[in-house]
């Protein structure tokens, strides 16, 4: 799904949070221009959307987190959110970075690139018309290591299967590499 709209990541995350984590009392509201954008709760699956370097945990350890890191919120304190990030461990994310921590029950195909999940539920509809193509569908399917479920409008799926996004670009990369590789080096 795309970021905004009826069938968007934001909508799906809101619904998933209500189903999977409805009762968590500890929460932190992410505000923008005085309006609640989303609510983070203990137990939520989240995704970090911006690199943050040199986070100093209370035990003195220094940790970096990167765009696309997934985790689970373990606690919410006055000045930080404790998140258990996959492959990193527990990180005390300062609340100043909280606007870059989004719900991660549903993520965009772009955010999922480079990741693998046991089960992926992919969605295709005409709300993301401009993005519909074979490459998007391929990326979506190949994120699943065991099971892929597709929820699609039939016409949108037919359109995606017939449209290619790859643009053939004219570059001089091969010429430059050929020239570089054929140079003689004096040592």
Which residues make up each language-model segment?
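C-terminal accessory regions
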Residues: 59, 67-187
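Conserved helicase/translocase motor-coupling segment
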Residues: 1-67
């Amino acid at each position: 799904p795309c970021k905004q709209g009826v069938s968007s990541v934001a909508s799906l995350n809101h619904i998933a949070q209500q189903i999977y984590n409805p009762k968590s009392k500890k929460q932190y509201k992410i505000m923008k221009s005085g309006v609640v954008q989303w609510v983070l709760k203990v137990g939520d699956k989240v995704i970090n959307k911006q690199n943050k370097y040199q986070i100093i945990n209370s035990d003195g350890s220094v940790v970096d987190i990167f765009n696309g890191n997934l985790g689970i919120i373990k606690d919410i304190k006055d000045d930080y959110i404790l998140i258990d990030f996959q492959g990193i461990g527990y990180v005390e994310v300062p609340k100043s970075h909280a606007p870059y921590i989004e719900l991660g029950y549903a993520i965009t195909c772009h955010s999922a690139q480079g990741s693998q999940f046991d089960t992926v539920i992919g969605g295709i509809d005409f709300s993301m018309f401009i993005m519909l193509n074979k490459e998007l569908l391929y990326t979506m399917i190949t994120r699943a290591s065991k099971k892929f479920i597709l929820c699609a409008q039939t016409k949108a799926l037919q359109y995606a299967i017939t449209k290619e996004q790859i643009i053939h670009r004219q570059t001089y990369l091969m010429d430059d590499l050929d020239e570089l590789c054929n140079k003689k080096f004096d040592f």
